[in-house]
Amino acid sequence: MSEEKNLPTKYQPTEIEAGRYQKWLDQDLFKPSGDKKAKPYSIVIPPPNVTGKLHLGHAWDTTLQDMIIRQKRMQGFDTLWLPGMDHAGIATQAKVEEKLAQQGISRYDLGREKFVDQVWEWKEEYASHIREQWAKMGLSLDYSRERFTLDEGLSEAVRKVFVSLYEKDLIYRGEYIINWDPKAKTALSDIEVIHKDIEGAFYHMSYPLSDGSGVVEIATTRPETMLGDTAIAVHPEDERYQELIGKTVVLPLVDKEIPIIADDYVDMEFGTGVVKITPAHDPNDFEVGNRHDLPRVNVMNEDGTMNELAGKYEGMDRFAARKAIVSDLKELGRLIKIETMNHSVGHSERTGVVVEPRLSTQWFVKMGPLAEKAMKNQETEDAVEFYPPRFNQTFLRWMENVHDWVISRQLWWGHQIPAWYHKETGEMYVGMEEPADSENWVQDSDVLDTWFSSALWPFSTMGWPNEASEDYQRYFPTSTLVTGYDIIFFWVSRMIFQSLEFTGERPFQNVLIHGLIRDEQGRKMSKSLGNGIDPMDVIEKYGADALRWFLSNGSAPGQDVRFSYEKMDASWNFINKIWNASRFVIMNVEGMTAADIDFSGEKTVADRWILTRLNETVARVTELFDRFEFGEAGRQLYNFIWDDFCDWYIEMSKEILYGDNEAAKQTTRSILVYTLDQILRLLHPIMPFVTEEIWEKIPHQGESLVVAEYPVVHEEFNDEAAARGMEVLKEVIRSVRNIRAEVNTPLSKPITLLIKTNDTEVEEFLTANTSYLERFCNPEELVISREIEAPELAMSAVLTGAELFLPLAGLINIEEEIARLEKELDKWTKEVKRVQGKLSNERFVSNAPDEVVEAERAKEKDYLEKQEAVKERIAQLRSI
C-alpha cells in the first residue's frame, strides 16, 4: 500500500483539520451548484454581532445550520448558505466607547464622523475574527455573498422600508414611555433589558387631603418619581374610597394639589388600593394619564440626574435623590414605613445600569396591522412551520399582545433615520434621499434599532428591493431558519411580519428553535458566573468534529443542552473508534480501487445483515434529519457504527479476510469499503473534517465528500431473514460472554454450549452459522437441538426463540468462586459504608463544594449497584 493511503496510527484532530477548510474554499465547494434543474435550498445565517468572539451558543446554532446545508448539498439540492454580520448598534458602540474611555477619550471629543470611523475599524477587526472562527468550525458558507447590515444594499432596503411604512402611516413620531439607559443615553428595545431580582423597598407615604379631612396612604418603590406625580388613583368600585373620588391631595415636598381619580387599572387587592400616577415615568401611568388628560411632568435628565422640575433635588443622581426624598419625608412626618422586598428590576444589557422608564419623543412602528397580517398567514398553507410546533403558539400569543415598537435610538452607530427637519420652518421630510436643498435641512440624529435592519435580513441579503435580482428570484423565500428560543419575539416575529408586508411571502418555510447551552449543573453560561466556554478552546483540545458531534448529538428541537468535558471525551472516543475501524478497513483493502468494489456474488449472513442494517440506518437518519431531530439521528448513527459495524461486522469479517476463499474475500472487502463509504457520507454533515480525511484514503470516486451523493435506501439489500437470524446469533454470543464474565472464565477456556430451540428458523440459522459461534464462544462441544434437557449444574439464558445452557462441571469450582465473590462483596460493602458515612456528615455536605458532594453521591450509587450485582451472582451460584 502506498504511503499516502495509510491513516496515521493515532487520531490527531489538529493535524487533520489544518488546511482542510482552505482546500474546500480553493475547490469552490460551498457555492450553489448553479444547476437550474435542482431544487433550491437556502439558509441565511443569523448574523452575529461584530462585538467580539463567538460563544458556544453560536457554535451550536451554526453547527446545526451547517449539518442541514451539507446534507441538502449532498442530496443534490442547489444550496445557498449566506453568511453575514450585524452592526449591533448599542452593543458595538458601547464596546468602542469603552475602549476609547481607557484612553481618556469620549465619543463627543471625536465627533460623530470620526467616532463612526473608529467603529468601522472595530468592525473590520472583529469581522475577521468571526470568519476565522467560522473556518475553525468548518462552516460551508458562500463567502462571495457575505453581507453586513450596514452594507449599501441593505441600507437601501432599510430606507425603503422606513419610508414605505411612514407613507402607510405605520411609522409615526410620538411621545411615549420607553426603556431608557441613563449611561448610554438611549432608548432600549425590550430585548436589551435584562430583568434581575434585587433587594428593594416599598416606601409607604401619606398624602394629606387638601380639605384637611385626613390622609391617603401610598406605597411606591421609586419615591424619587413622586415629584412628577399628577394624580393619585383608586378603583371606581372600591367602596373604601368612593367619597374621595374628585377630591384633591397635596403632593408632599412639592406643595401642589393633584386630583384623586378613579380608574380600572388600580388593583383593589394590592397594597392600600391607592396608587400614585406619574405619567412621565411609568408606562401604565402614562396610559392612565392619557385617559384622564393628566399633565406629564418629567423630573429627570437623560443621564438619570434630577432636572429643574425636581426643585431642590436638581442635579442629584436619581438614587441619591431617592435617599434625600425619603429622609425629607421622614422629617415631615410623611413616611409611614419602609418594607424590604425582592423585586424584578430592568437593567441595560449593555451597560448594566438600572433602566429608567422615561417619557421621550421617539419613532414607533404601529404594530396592530402588521401583527394581524402575520397571524392570519399562520392560518394558511404558507404558514411558517415551527419546530417544535409549540412555538407557533408562543409566536401567536406575542403577536396578539404586541405593543407599538420603538425603533429610534440615541446612538451614532447604525442606520440614521431618513427624516430631515427644515432649519427655519421645522417642517419634516421623510424620503429615500436627502432633500434637494440639503443645506436648509438637518437630518434626524437618531439611528434605527438594530432589529429594524435585521428584520429585513432574509430578503435584503438576496437583493431586495431589486426583486429582479437572481438570488432573490432563486433563493427567496429561504428554506429554514435556525435560532434560539430567546429571540423568537424580537427577531423571528419581526422578520415574519416585515417579509409578509414587503414581499408578500413568508421569509422562511421552517424555523428550527433550539434551546440554550448550559453548564454541567444546568446553569445558564454567563460572565458573572464565570462558567462560559470558548468553543475555540474546545476545538484546540478535541477538534471541531468532536465539538460538532457533541452539539448535534445533544440536540432536540426546543431543548437546552448541558456542556461537559466528560461528554467531549465521549465524542472524541467515538471519532477515535471510527478512525481505528477505518484503519482496519484500509489495511485490508490494499490495492483496491473504486472500480473493484463488487459484492454481487455470494454473501455471508453477516454481509447480508450489515447491508440490511445500513439500509435501516439510512432511512431512519434521513427521516430524522428532515424533522430536525438531530440528537436521535446521532444515536441511530452511533449504534450502527459502534455496535453493528465496529463491534460485530468487522469482527465477523475477519473469519473471511483471514481465510482462503478469494471470492468471499472480494465480497467482504467490497462490503467493508462500501459500508464505510456510506458511514462517512452519513456522518459528513456532522463531522466534515475527519470524514473527508478518511474518505480520501479509501477507494472512492469524486473530488470531495462535500459534494458526494448522500446515501439512499437500496431495497435489494434488505434481507429480513438474515437480520432476524443475526439478532439471535448476537444474543447467543452476548449471553455466553455475560456468563463467562459472571463465573470469571476467560474466552481462552473452552466450554460446552447447549442451545435448545423449538423454532425451525432459529435452529436452521444457528446450525448454518456455527463458525461464528465457534469463533466468538470457543465451545469444545456445541449442540443445537430440540431435545436438550437442562443440566443440573449449569448457567442458562432465555433468548428469542431459544434457551442456552452452559454446564459448569469442570469449568469452575463453585465453592472457590463463591469465596472469591464474597471477598469482592466485602470490598464493596466497605466502600458503601465509607461513602455513606461521608454523606451523612452534615458538615461535609454543607461545606464541601457542590461538585465534590455530587461526586460522592455518584460513587455511592456506583458502589451500591456493584454490591447488588455481586450478591445476585453469589445467590445464583448457590442455587445451582
From Swiss-Prot:
Binding of ATP, residues: 527
EC annotation from Swiss-Prot or TrEMBL: 6.1.1.9
UniProt keyword annotations, A-Z: Aminoacyl-tRNA synthetase, ATP-binding, Coiled coil, Cytoplasm, Ligase, Nucleotide-binding, Protein biosynthesis
Statement: the UniProt record of this protein carries the keyword Transmembrane helix: no
Pfam families found in the cross-reference section: Anticodon_1, tRNA-synt_1, Val_tRNA-synt_C
Enzyme class: ligase
CC annotations in GO: cytosol
Name the UniProt record assigns to this protein: Valine--tRNA ligase
Keyword Cytoplasm found: yes
